[in-house]
């Protein structure tokens, strides 16, 4: 039977149908090949927006730099980055006037954080540019490599374990005449195998020492590596994103800590809160504007879009903001915070992998690395690429492009939000000094502007004034992409507001389904997603029940665990049928062992093992949850685990789900193919870290684990902890005198070895 799709909408209010227009079903688009072209686009565009600025040359690296600050006053409609310093300082002053003490208090909070943060803060995050190897690595490995190189070059402040001391080393490293680094490489040799007499390729791993002079080191320290942003829906073209190295990250973290603390105190800021809390905050602003515009005033809302937000922002502006916000603070604190924007003013963008050429006739492929783009003959490229390369050539140094203006995506989300909110703050009547006034919401580059005025002319005048004020701060509201509506209907950060927020359910679609971690986690995550959507996203009981049935079906097909009494034949059905027949209480079998599904929408919060525990045969319980069973995962399981959910919009979210350790919570083994690559050295490092961290956790179980405040190394902390525990155990009679003496002896030996080292 054919269904006319319009029939689906007869009973649905128009605003609820918005979900169906979102491009969120099916797989998102991924990028293939190199991001070099996208990165060149970003660099060229950024320079174009600031082209009337002043050119200077960096004395240390020789990089040409463009400074658009206080440049010509911007033209209408053309995006530009000519922010005016005095205007920025003035909006900051007004922001402080409306929120007395806001900067002062945030600085005090941040200073406390700065003094307590440990270096391991930098291990969070995924791919990071590792300057020692000149490519991306997991954050923990990149940090370890940096610290290792620092220590071998005599920089040891980081040994205290405090982030601020690591940053002292970073500053110190920039003054050094040269830095020695160790790089991993691999040699391939063709040799004849003795047994089979065939030729095989032998790989050997090597490490070689290399010295970087001051200029080369600075270039690497200031480099942001670029990649293509993956899985962006609803866009035709891909775009480049940046990942900074370890030298920059710590400084950025402290600036963002200050900015976050300020954003928390600003009612117009959509960051750092999320979800329902964010919706409540937004609803408050809308309510305020609507109640104040009862009969006499008109109220309109702009769903705003800014043109190329990051590419027109400028690190020099951020420096001015920080200088103002910290003006009464201690010198050391002001210095620490000003380093991030200074580094960004001197940043270099790494152009990625370069271009791949292939000749159809000769079946040849060759890679042109980014380093060669400065000198290669351009006749090999097509027109558009040739133009890009010609434009970027004057900026190239050692395969990286000098990129002084502009910020890269996602680096200073909080700080740029403060800048946006400071303009919204100017909309109060005491500042506009006329009949129109405005307020709104800002979340990084996304904004909604609510303008109230007695008549349409007033609304128009208010919007114009807002638009021009933005221009003075290097913010370019797009007249083409922003639209205005009577207040009550607008969109902000993919929340649709129509007299209240409408659930945009399509955004959650990608997280329904089987995650593919393991049988235990997948079951738990699947039902938690349904539960969360009933709470947060208007998922009604009937739909939830259907979602649950579809999920169970999907789960059974994924893991081939159809019910024991089914006719479906799979690879597992033989074993599952056998288990089914010898089980007395069949309701107690887990779904993944061919049991029935006992979930309904009322008990989604209970882990399946707990739900069925009373129904299980005793020997089944013993096999399923016996810690001596070699198939039960031996990690000490916390009661809560975290899954990373990829919603359709915004960053990956952490989602908590109940974790019960059973034979089904297996952890898949690492793919073997990495063992044959130059990453092998890295794997060794990773395993060593893993062992150290596991050992540390044994000494400080999470129940009693307070971060060691004060300055001690991991070893010192563990030794002192071992002594305390041993004494307590000895005095309470849990261990004998001989054992106690032996423990004390081992502790002394460890300390002695450390001293000799």
UniProtKB/Swiss-Prot annotation:
Single GO biological process annotation from the record: DNA-templated transcription
PROSITE patterns: RDRP_SSRNA_NEG_SEG
GO molecular function annotations of the record: nucleotide binding; RNA binding; RNA-directed RNA polymerase activity
Record region (Disordered): 53-82
GO cellular component terms given for this protein: host cell cytoplasm; host cell nucleus
Enzyme Commission (EC) number: 2.7.7.48
UniProtKB keywords: Eukaryotic host gene expression shutoff by virus, Eukaryotic host transcription shutoff by virus, Host cytoplasm, Host gene expression shutoff by virus, Host nucleus, Host-virus interaction, Inhibition of host RNA polymerase II by virus, Nucleotide-binding, Nucleotidyltransferase, Phosphoprotein, RNA-directed RNA polymerase, Transferase, Viral RNA replication, Viral transcription
Quaternary state and interactors: Influenza RNA polymerase is composed of three subunits: PB1, PB2 and PA. Interacts (via N-terminus) with PA (via C-terminus). Interacts (via C-terminus) with PB2 (via N-terminus); this interaction is essential for transcription initiation.
Protein name as it appears in the record: RNA-directed RNA polymerase catalytic subunit
